[in-house]
């Protein structure tokens, strides 16, 4: 039944039937928690890994004792960092201790280790003034993976891979002769028995005794030509280090360092957890029949007798009492199962050890040694602390390798199972914290090398920690990560939703991940383990489809980096749904059967039906109630935030829903945001978590409200909290960020109450578009191919008007000929052009500018030329005054116009940090009001997108019987073939709701159904089919059929025609071919390509063809003469030879072919090498505006030179964030707009 729900300050009528259990987590906690972990634990782990650094003699010992981020000495606030192009960071100070073992002297110092970028409260970083997001990466989890292939004879071949976090890989494979091979670190393969011998089982008898009788093992031993441990070691050494003289000692130490050295081989916590989970003996002996008595080694009691079946609890008990080898019976054969000897420490120690914080399994032999030698609690705890790295080794151990080999042998007896690498139990997230930690570790290990070198060079008596440590490698690796890693992206700030989604994005690309080319179909596909963890709908269309995903609404990331989703526990005794919520990873979930969230249950939680629909792995089954163990907590838990904002998602086709999710993220913030009439109820949560809205830090009373500041008097101590609002700031994408207060003076606010609206929010709900009265009706062909017909009212009343702010900067540099100067005194510029320029040479705020207007007047010294006699005379009379300068002012680029809203000036005198060689920097911000116009792209939320084809006067639009004209006409043919019926239901419900004055929440998969909509239409007094008679605005006649009319929520997308339209007559030309450049950014021309030439040839349009290929393109002399002729009104001269023809001739000559050009009389035509003289004589420059491109190149060269000169200062330079020009970009570099959809 429809019922009211309070969201923020608005009441929505909700159609949901289910009571949601449990709260949605904070939507950006992926970022916040991960960074928090890094500061608290991640950094410490890296220091622990690297401690202590010893010199080669073992005398000096350098240790990192502790660290702190000095949050008090942060240079600038977040806002100031954005203004000053600096990085929001805090200094990292590390306490370092140096011990000289000879003298016993200890020196301690606090060492500054560079500025460490801090995360803002919104989950972003400010790097060089630009807001960036670190995207989480989906990678394969370290662990051991088994796979099976079937060869052509039909026999099963098993293989395995042991993947560490870092270190050498081990791969096992079986060939069709049943011989098992191993590859160490991707080298050639060896029989696996060689590895077993080298690790300690030297003879054939020992191998067979340890691993048990097995056909494949015997076949492998026959193939193996080594017979002792020494031979095996030498054989492995020859393979791994070919060309070096093999000795047993060096081979032993090689294997030690490859696998058993924590500095070279790291499984990481996740790897150890996955290893123990996969190789635990209890999983493989459960439900098998014991072939010998199994005895508890501590007490001697028989746990399982020969011939008895081992149940699950017994199997766990067997493992935890330290039994590592069990014989089981399979088809009259005895098979020996070997585990990796890890046990649950809590089952072996009777007293409380929770303060040791051990969650993982521990290595039994080490634990047994401790328990045998110590008796009292304290000393046992102390020993466990001391031996923690032996109990939970970070590297692989021999027992692990034996267990992996045994697992491989067992697979052919159907013991164990093969792994699915696309399962989310085998893929994990590396979030900000871990990515940073890895980067920091790289920097520290580079530093370690430097420290060791310095230890040997410098005098050991007077040496200090400060003198040993060089922080540059650490600072550089962090800087490089934030500045240029594929996962550090320029934040998509088009609107709050795009910001939120960017922070929740999961990418399988990036360093250590997949590449677009290698990723096959399986990796990209939807997998059953994605349910509730990753959205099956929101992903880009294009080369990245399925590689970039979005986190589902309720998902969390656990300490190991696996994505978890919440379920309600079903009480096993009386089978009622409890309110206990359990977060489960994908591999835990596979063990249970899980009911749907909309399964009918009564108010006490009992199921109403005897049979229940459940999910079990990838199956959907119907089972009796008694078998159900868990239940989903919400119908929207399987989709992402953007997808959950599509009402009636359940009635849309998936591919259109995908477009709908992606296009909401491209909606431009409008002048007056308006929340949707038909929403889904998640709008409020999305806006509050996105970080664009100011919230009250403490409870209190509003004491003062103005447009740019809100003050709240705290209840606790009567103090005042001040909140500055952002007014008309530019976002990363050039849209406008503007906050408006929504509280009034005297209002009582609780903690976390929203105080103001931001861009695209309305009363704290995300409001990306407008509710528009529309009808599905064709109109004179203006609806053809998804085009839209709109009413002039939308233009006049600024319904779809948005503000866009562009930033332009000019810098005055030192050049070789003297400094550039910012001034009002510009050569050859009239007073008219300077009317809005102040005395400093900078445009005034509030001035209206058009393309070509001067923003910042700037002159650059010209090179000294040979002076004529007259000039020398003038020089002599007037001194330096006549020195030549040229105008290099910053002008408004082509096709831009607007109003100056802000000007910022940075100079050295004011103490601003500027790049080397720059004396003054001026930034101008130009704002434009863009009304909706023909060619703009608009879309609904259901993937129904289109371009505006015509703006019709209001009086010509079709109108309703009550006289209201429609605002937009959409083509009814856009609905059936696309199967996004959600838009029709939205229109019907919108019609009824607007009449009833309701705002509606219809949550995905749990919203209004057809009967609810019919009830609403009836209540509002409309006919039940939602159709009405429409009248033609031009004639007043009714249309033939009744038409579906109602309110649809429509967005204006960031693909605006003003940014795309472009025209050129003359302009810059390419250097070699002399053809016009391409693209709007280069002020280029339209390419007349091969196929277009064919078209003209087909029509026989010879003269048109000739002029297009010569004077309109690359006939250098001809085009200048033609331009002159047009200007003077003369006849157009004959075309000359195109430059690209000359280039072709030169290329052939470069291939040593003697190519000549002959005329009709077989006379050779001399092609002039250079046409510059001819052009100079003509004295016409058609290269475009004031040689701007030349200046750009000069500037770039200068910058390069400056960088080279200041290579030491390079670290302090800001790296410029240049927004890429999309038309010129190769696909490989495309990060930010990967989700963009250009059709």
From Swiss-Prot:
The RNAP catalytic core consists of 2 alpha, 1 beta, 1 beta' and 1 omega subunit. When a sigma factor is associated with the core the holoenzyme is formed, which can initiate transcription. Residues 1182-1239 are annotated as: Disordered. SUPFAM superfamilies: beta and beta-prime subunits of DNA dependent RNA-polymerase. It catalyses: RNA(n) + a ribonucleoside 5'-triphosphate = RNA(n+1) + diphosphate. Residues 1191-1200, 1206-1239 have a biased composition (Acidic residues). It is an enzyme of class 2 (transferase). Keywords: DNA-directed RNA polymerase, Nucleotidyltransferase, Transcription, Transferase. Belongs to the RNA polymerase beta chain family. Pfam families: RNA_pol_Rpb2_1 (PF04563), RNA_pol_Rpb2_2 (PF04561), RNA_pol_Rpb2_3 (PF04565), RNA_pol_Rpb2_45 (PF10385), RNA_pol_Rpb2_6 (PF00562), RNA_pol_Rpb2_7 (PF04560). GO terms for molecular function: DNA binding; DNA-directed RNA polymerase activity; ribonucleoside binding. NCBIfam families: PRK00405.1, rpoB. GO terms for biological process: DNA-templated transcription. InterPro entries: DNA-dir_RNA_pol_bsu_ext_1_sf, DNA-dir_RNA_pol_bsu_external_1, DNA-dir_RNA_pol_su2, DNA-dir_RNAP_su2_dom, DNA-dir_RNAP_su2_hyb_sf, RNA_pol_bsu_bac, RNA_pol_bsu_CS, RNA_pol_bsu_protrusion. Signal peptide: none annotated. GO terms for cellular component: DNA-directed RNA polymerase complex. This is DNA-directed RNA polymerase subunit beta. DNA-dependent RNA polymerase catalyzes the transcription of DNA into RNA using the four ribonucleoside triphosphates as substrates. PANTHER family: DNA-DIRECTED RNA POLYMERASE I SUBUNIT 2 (PTHR20856). Its EC number is 2.7.7.6.
């Amino acid at each position: 039944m429809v019922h009211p729900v309070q969201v923020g300050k608005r009441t929505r009528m909700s159609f949901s039937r289910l009571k949601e259990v449990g709260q949605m987590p904070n939507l950006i906690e992926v970022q916040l928690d991960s960074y928090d972990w890094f500061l608290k634990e991640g950094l410490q782990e890296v220091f622990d890994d690297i401690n202590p650094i010893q010199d080669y003699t073992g005398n000096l010992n350098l240790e990192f004792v502790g660290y702190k981020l000095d949050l008090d000495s942060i240079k600038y606030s977040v806002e100031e960092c954005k203004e000053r192009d600096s990085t929001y960071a805090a200094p990292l100070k590390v306490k370092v201790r140096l011990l000289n073992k000879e003298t016993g002297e200890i020196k301690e110092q606090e060492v500054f280790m560079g500025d460490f970028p801090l995360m803002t409260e919104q989950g972003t970083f400010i790097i060089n003034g630009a807001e960036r997001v670190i995207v989480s990466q989906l990678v394969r989890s370290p662990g051991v993976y088994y796979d099976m292939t079937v060869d052509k004879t039909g026999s099963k071949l098993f293989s395995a891979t042991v993947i560490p976090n870092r270190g050498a890989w081990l791969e096992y494979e079986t060939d069709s002769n049943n011989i098992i091979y191993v590859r160490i670190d991707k080298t050639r393969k060896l029989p696996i028995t060689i590895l077993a011998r080298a690790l300690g089982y030297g003879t054939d008898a020992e191998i067979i005794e340890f691993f048990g009788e097995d056909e494949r093992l015997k076949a492998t031993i026959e193939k193996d030509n080594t017979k002792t441990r020494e031979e095996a070691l030498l054989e492995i050494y020859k393979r791994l280090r070919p060309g070096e003289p093999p000795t047993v000692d060096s081979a032993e130490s090689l294997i030690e360092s490859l696998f058993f050295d924590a500095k070279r081989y790291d499984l990481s916590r996740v790897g150890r957890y996955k290893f123990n989970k996969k190789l635990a003996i209890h999983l493989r002996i459960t439900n098998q029949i014991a072939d010998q008595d199994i005895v508890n080694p501590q007490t001697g009691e028989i746990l399982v007798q020969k011939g008895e079946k081992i149940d699950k609890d017994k199997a766990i008990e067997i493992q935890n009492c330290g039994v590592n080898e069990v014989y089981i019976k399979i088809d009259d054969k005895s098979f020996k199962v070997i585990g990796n000897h890890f046990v649950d420490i809590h089952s072996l120690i009777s007293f409380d050890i929770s303060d040791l914080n051990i969650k993982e399994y521990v290595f039994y032999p080490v634990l047994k040694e401790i328990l045998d030698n110590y008796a009292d609690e304290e000393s046992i705890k102390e020993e466990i602390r001391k031996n923690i790295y032996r109990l939970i080794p970070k590297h692989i151990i021999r027992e692990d390798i034996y267990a992996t080999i045994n697992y491989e042998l067992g697979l052919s007896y159907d013991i164990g199972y093969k792994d699915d690498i696309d399962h989310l139990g085998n893929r994990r997230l590396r979030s900000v914290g871990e990515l940073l930690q890895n980067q920091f570790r790289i920097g520290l290990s580079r530093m370690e090398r430097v420290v060791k070198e310095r230890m040997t060079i410098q005098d050991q008596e007077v040496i200090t920690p400060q003198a040993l440590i060089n922080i540059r490698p650490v600072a550089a690796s962090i800087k490089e990560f934030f500045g240029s890693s594929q996962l550090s992206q320029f934040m998509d700030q088009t609107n709050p939703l795009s910001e939120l989604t960017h922070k929740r994005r999961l990418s399988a690309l990036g360093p250590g991940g997949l590449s677009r080319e290698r990723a096959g179909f399986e990796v990209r596909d939807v997998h059953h383990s994605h349910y509730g963890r990753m959205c099956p709908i929101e992903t880009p269309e294009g080369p990245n489809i399925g590689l970039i995903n979005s986190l589902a609404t309720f998902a969390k990331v656990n300490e190991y980096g696996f994505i978890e989703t919440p379920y309600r526990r079903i009480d096993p005794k009386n089978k009622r749904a409890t309110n206990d919520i359990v977060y489960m990873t994908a591999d835990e979930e596979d063990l249970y059967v899980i009911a749907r969230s909309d399964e009918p249950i009564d108010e006490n939680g009992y199921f109403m039906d005897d049979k229940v629909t459940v999910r079990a792995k990838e199956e959907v089954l119907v089972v009796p109630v008694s078998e159900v163990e868990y239940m989903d907590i919400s119908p929207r838990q399987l989709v992402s935030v953007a997808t959950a904002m599509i009402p009636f998602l359940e009635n849309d086709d998936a591919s259109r829903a995908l477009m709908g999710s992606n296009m909401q993220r491209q909606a431009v913030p409008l002048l007056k945001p308006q929340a949707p009439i038909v929403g889904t109820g998640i709008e409020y949560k999305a806006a509050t978590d996105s970080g664009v809205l100011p919230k009250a830090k403490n409870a209190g009373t509003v004491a003062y409200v103005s447009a740019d500041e809100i003050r709240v008097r705290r209840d606790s101590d009567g103090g005042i909290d001040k909140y500055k609002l952002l007014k008309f700031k530019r976002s990363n994408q050039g849209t406008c960020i503007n906050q408006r207060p929504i509280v009034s003076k005297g209002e009582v606010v609780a903690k976390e109450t929203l105080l103001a609206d931001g861009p695209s929010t309305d009363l704290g709900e995300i409001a990306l578009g407008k509710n528009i009265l529309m009808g599905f009706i064709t109109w004179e062909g203006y609806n053809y191919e998804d085009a839209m017909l709109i009413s002039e009212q939308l233009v006049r009343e600024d319904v779809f008007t948005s503000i866009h702010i562009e930033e332009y900067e000019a810098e005055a540099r030192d050049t070789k000929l003297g400094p550039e100067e910012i001034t009002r005194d510009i050569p050859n510029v009239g007073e008219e052009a300077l009317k809005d320029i102040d005395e400093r040479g900078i445009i005034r705020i509030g001035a209206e500018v058009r393309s070509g207007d001067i923003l910042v007047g700037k002159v650059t010294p010209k090179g000294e030329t040979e002076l004529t006699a007259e000039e020398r005379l003038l020089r002599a009379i007037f001194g330096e005054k006549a020195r030549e300068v040229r105008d290099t002012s910053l002008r408004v680029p082509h096709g831009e116009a607007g109003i100056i809203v802000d000007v910022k000036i940075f100079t050295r005198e004011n103490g601003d940090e500027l790049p080397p060689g720059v004396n003054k920097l001026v930034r101008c911000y130009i704002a434009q009001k863009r009304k909706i116009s023909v060619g703009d792209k608009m879309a609904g939320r259901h993937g129904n997108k289109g371009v505006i084809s015509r703006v019709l006067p209001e009086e010509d639009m079709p109108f309703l019987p009550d006289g209201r004209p429609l605002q937009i006409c959409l083509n009814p043919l856009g609905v059936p073939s696309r199967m996004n019926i959600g838009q029709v239901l939205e229109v019907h419900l919108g019609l009824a709701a607007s009449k009833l004055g309701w705002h509606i929440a219809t949550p995905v998969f749990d919203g209004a159904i057809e009967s609810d909509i019919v009830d609403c239409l009836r209540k509002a007094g409309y006919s039940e089919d939602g159709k009405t008679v429409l009248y033609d605005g031009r004639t007043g006649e009714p249309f033939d059929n009744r038409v579906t009319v109602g309110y649809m929520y429509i967005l204006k997308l960031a693909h605006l025609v003003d940014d795309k339209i472009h025209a050129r007559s003359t302009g810059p030309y390419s250097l070699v071919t002399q053809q016009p450049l391409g693209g709007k950014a280069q002020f280029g021309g339209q390419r007349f390509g091969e196929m277009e030439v064919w078209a003209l040839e087909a029509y026989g349009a010879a003269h048109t063809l000739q002029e297009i290929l010569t004077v309109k393109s690359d006939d250098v002399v001809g085009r200048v003469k033609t331009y002159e002729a047009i200007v003077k009104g003369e006849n157009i001269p004959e075309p000359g030879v195109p430059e690209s023809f000359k280039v072709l001739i030169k290329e052939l000559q470069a291939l040593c072919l003697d190519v000549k050009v002959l005329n009709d009389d077989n006379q050779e035509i001399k092609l002039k090498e250079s046409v510059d003289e001819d052009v100079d004589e003509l004295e016409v420059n058609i290269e475009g505006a004031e040689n701007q491109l030349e200046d750009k190149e000069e500037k770039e060269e200068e910058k390069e030179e400056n960088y080279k000169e200041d290579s030491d200062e390079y670290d302090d330079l800001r790296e410029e964030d240049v927004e890429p020009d999309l038309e010129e970009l190769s696909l490989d570099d495309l990060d930010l707009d990967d989700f963009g959809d250009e059709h």
